[in-house]
């Protein structure tokens, strides 16, 4: 009896110790946007692991991140605030649990030398992420402030990184950051 109590206590202690060290697996989709760098830094520095999380970070373009959430490929997503509204409206039930940072003026538009005003963009090609993303909202806002809409330009769906690369390579007349 004493041996079985001792064995039971040892098993319980082992189970509790193992449970305390068990890591919760979490898969998170994000982009290479600078504001999400703390996620990679936390993983590389072992901060997630130290706090009982086994985090898998997967780069997924903004335009399809909600599909990965809906399908269960990822459990969490790092994205911009307005995106949660768009995803929920599209039937992908999500909840924002925290905000990593705030952008004060980091978003903008790069244009060719011959573009001196928003009126000069009429009929030109602008690279911007999909509708519902910060770059697209900013483009629509800036155009509206200048008496235009996204119908006045040709919007090419490109994430900021590829949009910048394409712009530098001479493609598109403008690119949203």
Where do the model's predicted regions map?
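Absolute protein N-terminus
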Residues: 1, 22-23
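Bacterial N-terminal signal peptides that target proteins for export
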Residues: 1-7
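Bacterial N-terminal signal peptides
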Residues: 8-15
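Sec/Tat signal peptide C-region and signal peptidase I cleavage site
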Residues: 16-22
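Short, glycine-/small- and polar/acidic-enriched structural segments
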Residues: 23-162, 173-177
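Acidic/His-rich structured neighborhood in mature extracellular/periplasmic domains
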Residues: 165
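Conserved, function-defining micro-sites of small-solute handling proteins
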Residues: 169
């Amino acid at each position: 009896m004493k041996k079985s109590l001792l064995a039971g206590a040892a098993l319980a202690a082992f189970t509790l110790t193992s449970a305390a060290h068990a890591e919760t697996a979490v898969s998170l989709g994000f982009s290479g946007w600078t504001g999400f760098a703390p996620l990679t830094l936390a993983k590389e520095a072992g901060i997630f692991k130290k706090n009982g999380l086994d985090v898998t970070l997967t780069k997924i373009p903004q335009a399809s991140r909600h599909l990965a959430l809906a399908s269960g490929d990822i459990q969490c997503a790092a994205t911009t605030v307005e995106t949660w509204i768009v995803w929920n409206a599209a039937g992908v039930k999500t909840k924002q649990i925290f905000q990593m940072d705030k952008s004060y003026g980091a978003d903008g538009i790069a244009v060719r030398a011959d573009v001196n005003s928003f009126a000069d963009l009429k009929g030109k090609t602008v690279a911007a992420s999909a509708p519902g993303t910060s770059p697209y909202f900013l483009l629509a806002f800036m155009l509206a402030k200048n008496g235009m809409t996204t119908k006045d330009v040709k919007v090419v769906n490109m994430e900021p990184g590829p949009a910048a690369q394409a712009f530098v390579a001479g493609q598109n007349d403008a690119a949203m950051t």
